[in-house]
C-alpha cells in the first residue's frame, strides 16, 4: 500500500516527536540525577549519538523509498536532516559550555585544531550547517545544479561522524562499532553513486593539475 500525503504528514509529526522526546528526557535526567558518574560526558555522548541516529535515519530514507516504492517518504528526509543538525549543535554546545566552560571558550579553536577527533567533529558540523541553511526549496532553486553537489557532502559526514565517535571513546564498545557498521552499510547501498562522484572529482582534479 502506498503512503498518502496525509499519512506522510502524520509521519512527520511522529518524527518531530522522536526528535523532541530525547531532549525532554535529557532535561529530566539532568534535573533528577538520571545521568552517570560523569554527567558532562553522558550529555556529550547522548547528544552526539542522537545526532548520529538522525543522520543514519536520513540516509536510510532514499534506499527505503526506492526499495519499498514509497516515493513520498522522501518528504521526510529534510526533517530528519534538520533534527540531525539540531542535535549536532547541542552536542557541540555541550562540549563548549560544559567541558571547556564559559570562561574558557577562547580555547575552543585551539582544541578543535589540536585534537584530531574534534577536528573531524567540527568539519562534520560545518557541513551540516551548510546543508541545513540550504535545505529549503528556494535555496535549491537559487543554487541550481550546485545544490546537489553541496548536499552530496552528507556522505562525507557519514564517514567522519562515526570515526569521530569511535575516536572520542576511551574504551571501544559495541555501540560505536554498530553505528559505524550501519553507516558503512548505508554508504554501500550507494556505491555506484559514490564511485561516480569519486571518478568525477578525480577527473576534475586531474584537469586542474594539467592546466
From Swiss-Prot:
Its main location: membrane. It is found in: Cell inner membrane. One of its GO terms (biological process) is protein repair. GO terms for cellular component: plasma membrane. The chain crosses the membrane at residues 8-28, 82-102, 116-136, 153-173, 178-198. Its cofactor is FMN; heme b. One of its GO terms (molecular function) is oxidoreductase activity, acting on diphenols and related substances as donors. Binds 1 FMN per subunit. Keywords: Cell inner membrane, Cell membrane, Electron transport, Flavoprotein, FMN, Heme, Iron, Membrane, Metal-binding, Transmembrane, Transmembrane helix, Transport. It holds the Pfam family Ferric_reduct. It is a multi-pass membrane protein. InterPro entries: Fe3_Rdtase_TM_dom, MsrQ-like. NCBIfam families: PRK05419.1-1 (NF003830), PRK05419.1-2 (NF003831), PRK05419.1-4 (NF003832). Belongs to the MsrQ family. Heterodimer of a catalytic subunit (MsrP) and a heme-binding subunit (MsrQ). Part of the MsrPQ system that repairs oxidized periplasmic proteins containing methionine sulfoxide residues (Met-O), using respiratory chain electrons. Thus protects these proteins from oxidative-stress damage caused by reactive species of oxygen and chlorine generated by the host defense mechanisms. MsrPQ is essential for the maintenance of envelope integrity under bleach stress, rescuing a wide series of structurally unrelated periplasmic proteins from methionine oxidation, including the primary periplasmic chaperone SurA and the lipoprotein Pal. This is Protein-methionine-sulfoxide reductase heme-binding subunit MsrQ. The gene is msrQ.
Amino acid at each position: 500500500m502506498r503512503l498518502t500525503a496525509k499519512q506522510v504528514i502524520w509521519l512527520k509529526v511522529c518524527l518531530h516527536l522522536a526528535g523532541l522526546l530525547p531532549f525532554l528526557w535529557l532535561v529530566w535526567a539532568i534535573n533528577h540525577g538520571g545521568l552517570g558518574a560523569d554527567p558532562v560526558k553522558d550529555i556529550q555522548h547522548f547528544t552526539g549519538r542522537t545526532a548520529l541516529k538522525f543522520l543514519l535515519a536520513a540516509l536510510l530514507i532514499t534506499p527505503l523509498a526506492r526499495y519499498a516504492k514509497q516515493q513520498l517518504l522522501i518528504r521526510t528526509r529534510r526533517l530528519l536532516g534538520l533534527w540531525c543538525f539540531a542535535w549536532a549543535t547541542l552536542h557541540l554546545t555541550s562540549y563548549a559550555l560544559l567541558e571547556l566552560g564559559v570562561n574558557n571558550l577562547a580555547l575552543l579553536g585551539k582544541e578543535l585544531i589540536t585534537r584530531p577527533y574534534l577536528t573531524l567533529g567540527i568539519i562534520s558540523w560545518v557541513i551540516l550547517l551548510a546543508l541545513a541553511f540550504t535545505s529549503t526549496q528556494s535555496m535549491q532553486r537559487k543554487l541550481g545544479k550546485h545544490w546537489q553537489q553541496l548536499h552530496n557532502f552528507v556522505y562525507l559526514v557519514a564517514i567522519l561522524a562515526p570515526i569521530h565517535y569511535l575516536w572520542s571513546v576511551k574504551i571501544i564498545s559495541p555501540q560505536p562499532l554498530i553505528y559505524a557498521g550501519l553507516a558503512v552499510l548505508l554508504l554501500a547501498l550507494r556505491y555506484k553513486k559514490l564511485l561516480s562522484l569519486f571518478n568525477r572529482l578525480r577527473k576534475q582534479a586531474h584537469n586542474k593539475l594539467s592546466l
